[in-house]
């Protein structure tokens, strides 16, 4: 497949499908189309009833992604690729999923909250943990919740007769995946009912605790009584 931008590895593509809960018929915004590897993976999972809307800031990347998709899946696929900057906003609404392969996805978090349907999922792919930390801070200060970050390490095994061991090489870190869900706001609680004023309790009668002591003193002073 002709490439311009670096593609997302198959081990991460599979994790995106599962953890972003990509389902047949979903409406998905993908930004950072690059060479179209994730785009093709999504289209195969969505089926003919779904739709992928791509936002790609570079015209050459957008063209390459379209050509790669057509070469592998044909021209009749539910895909729209627009040359635009997702950092400036998202016009689409009621989306099911938003998938980002961008240097600064935290700038998209406020736009994503307005474009996703409630319960929709935001998923971002990032190469460095410092980028992840910035993204997670933005998510924590937004309407998103249930956030998690992970990476996928793929290790194959050498299996030949009784020789069974891990291969000497593995596809380890390629990127971090962060997934969060747009939560439904909690309903406003009704005001607490007014409690009727209750009259003050009657003061208890004063008890003369000294009375018994005085009587005893009088008896001792007058033994003949």
Language-model segments: what does each one mean?
Residues 9, 34-35:
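Conserved SAM/SAH-binding loop
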Residues 25, 48-49, 116-121:
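Short glycine-dipeptide loop
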Residues 55-105:
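S-adenosyl-L-methionine
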Residues 35-48:
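Conserved SAM-binding loop of SAM-dependent methyltransferases across substrates and taxa
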Residues 25-34:
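Conserved class I S-adenosyl-L-methionine
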Residues 140-145, 154-225:
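Core SAM-dependent methyltransferase catalytic element
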Residues 106-176:
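C-terminal substrate-binding/active-site "lid" region of AdoMet-derived donor-dependent transferases
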Residues 1-13:
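Conserved SAM-binding loop and adjacent beta-strand
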């Amino acid at each position: 497949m002709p490439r311009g931008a670096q593609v997302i590895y198959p081990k991460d593509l599979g994790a995106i499908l599962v953890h972003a809960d990509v389902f047949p018929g979903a409406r998905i915004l993908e930004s950072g189309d690059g060479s179209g590897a994730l785009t093709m993976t999504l289209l195969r999972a969505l089926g003919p009833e779904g739709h992928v809307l791509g936002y790609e800031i570079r015209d050459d990347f957008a063209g390459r992604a379209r050509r790669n998709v057509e070469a592998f899946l044909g021209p009749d696929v539910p895909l729209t690729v627009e040359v635009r900057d997702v950092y400036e906003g998202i016009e689409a609404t009621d989306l099911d999923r938003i998938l980002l392969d961008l240097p600064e996805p935290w700038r998209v978090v406020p736009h994503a909250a307005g474009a996703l349907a409630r319960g929709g999922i935001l998923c971002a792919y990032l190469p460095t943990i410092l980028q992840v930390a910035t993204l997670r801070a933005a998510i924590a200060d937004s309407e998103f919740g249930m956030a998690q970050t992970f990476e996928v390490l793929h290790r194959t095994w050498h299996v030949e007769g009784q020789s069974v061991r891990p291969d000497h090489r593995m596809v380890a870190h390629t990127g971090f995946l962060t997934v969060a869900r747009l939560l439904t706001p909690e309903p406003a609680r009704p005001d607490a009912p007014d409690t009727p004023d209750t009259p003050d309790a009657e003061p208890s009668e004063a008890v003369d605790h000294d009375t018994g002591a005085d009587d005893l003193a009088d008896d001792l002073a007058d033994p003949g009584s």
